[in-house]
């Protein structure tokens, strides 16, 4: 019996920017609540410790992402740039709820690409 193939998990620059934006947002709330950044720090811990091994072993674990070009101008531009890549690589947009945050990722036959993150109460990805 052979071991299932584990796909490489690649964090895109957009994903890193989304995490930075979440950290900045929660850091800006510290004056309201001293523990404001704990959720974002927990997300970083989960991303670094659990997310990559989980998606490498089970890349289809997330639900199909419901992306809409009506969400916002930045989302629309991003989806328009992504469309040609999706057609060639046969990428599947999926999302996984990790703690309080949705992780947007794309699965291809050869890799998993972490694309963005948002709090579960946010309407669109960063």
Model feature map: region roles:
Residues 1-93:
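Basic, Lys/Arg-enriched alpha-helical interface segments
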Residues 2-4, 84-126:
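Enriched for short, Lys/Arg-rich terminal
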């Amino acid at each position: 019996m052979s071991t299932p193939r584990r796909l490489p998990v690649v964090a895109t620059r957009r994903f890193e920017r989304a995490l930075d934006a979440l950290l900045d947002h929660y850091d800006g709330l510290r004056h309201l609540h001293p523990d404001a950044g704990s959720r974002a720090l927990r997300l970083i811990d989960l991303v670094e410790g659990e997310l990559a091994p989980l998606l490498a072993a089970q890349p289809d674990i997330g639900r199909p992402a419901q992306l809409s070009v009506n969400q916002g101008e930045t989302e629309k531009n991003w989806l328009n740039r992504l469309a040609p890549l999706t057609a060639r690589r046969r990428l599947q947009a999926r999302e996984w709820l990790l703690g309080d945050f949705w992780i947007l990722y794309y699965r291809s036959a050869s890799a998993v690409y972490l694309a963005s993150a948002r709090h579960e109460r946010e309407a669109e990805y960063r």
